[in-house]
């Protein structure tokens, strides 16, 4: 069985619970092939780097994918005993056939300032009172979808069932059911919700990398504001997206155009 870890921006200690989960799986399945989809890397506590690297180095077949050059070089330096790849974010693997359904659904004049509200937001870069912009965060983070709650309940049930020896068959069934639910219900729902969110806008300013990526895929004018770890600029620089402008150097131009 090949084990796949989701990509994103949670490798390191910014979201430590995600990293701890990865480490537990890596330790529990030392002989299974494991592939981590493209990640951005960030450590506040540098003492954790060697500890994490030691756990991963003991695995027999672990591939770590980075989605920007800074993260790739970091992994090559500190996690060099594993196979390291530089790969675009998984959102770029959404099919053109799927994206084409949304590319024409634009309401001209509607503009989005996608402003994250979590610990990755650099509050020194906040733009207030943008004229004509909707100020939103990612919809599934503003309001947790019911399907994610159901999936969490199913996974929690499977976790507790595994502790009861006589119910291991039921535990496997619930776990398989949860996996099918995630693949057939949750994933399509979250993808559709993200596309429904971004596609109507004719212009986007974003503090989230996936807001940037979806805007690119939908061929929209987009500016970005870096998060606290610099992952947006790292991604833009890595994949030579020089026509995508960072707000900070152009803030006067943006404000002159859009702020009351």
Predicted region positions:
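Active-site anion-handling motifs in enzyme catalytic cores
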Residues: 1-260
């Amino acid at each position: 069985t090949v084990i796949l870890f989701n990509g994103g921006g949670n490798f390191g200690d910014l979201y430590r619970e995600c990293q701890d989960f990865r480490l537990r799986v890596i330790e529990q399945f030392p002989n299974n092939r494991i592939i981590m989809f493209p990640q951005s890397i960030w450590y506040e506590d540098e003492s954790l780097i060697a500890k994490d690297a030691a756990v991963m180095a003991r695995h027999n077949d672990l591939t770590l994918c980075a989605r920007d050059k800074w993260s790739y070089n970091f992994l090559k330096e500190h996690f060099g005993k594993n196979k390291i790849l530089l790969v675009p974010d998984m959102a770029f693997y959404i099919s053109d056939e799927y994206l084409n359904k949304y590319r024409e659904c634009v309401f001209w004049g509607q503009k989005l300032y996608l402003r994250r509200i979590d610990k990755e937001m650099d509050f020194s870069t906040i733009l207030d009172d943008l004229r004509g912009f909707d100020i939103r965060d990612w919809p599934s983070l503003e309001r947790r979808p019911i399907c994610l709650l159901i999936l969490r309940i199913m996974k929690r049930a499977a976790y507790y069932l595994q502790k009861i020896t006589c119910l291991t068959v039921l535990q496997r069934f619930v776990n398989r059911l949860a996996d099918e639910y995630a693949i057939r219900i949750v994933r399509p729902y979250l993808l559709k919700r993200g596309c429904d969110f971004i596609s109507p806008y004719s212009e986007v300013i974003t503090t989230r990398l996936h807001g940037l990526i979806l805007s690119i895929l939908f061929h929209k004018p987009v500016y970005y504001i870096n998060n606290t770890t610099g992952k947006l600029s790292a991604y833009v620089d890595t994949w030579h997206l020089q026509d995508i402008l960072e707000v900070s150097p152009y803030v006067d131009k943006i404000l002159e155009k859009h702020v009351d």
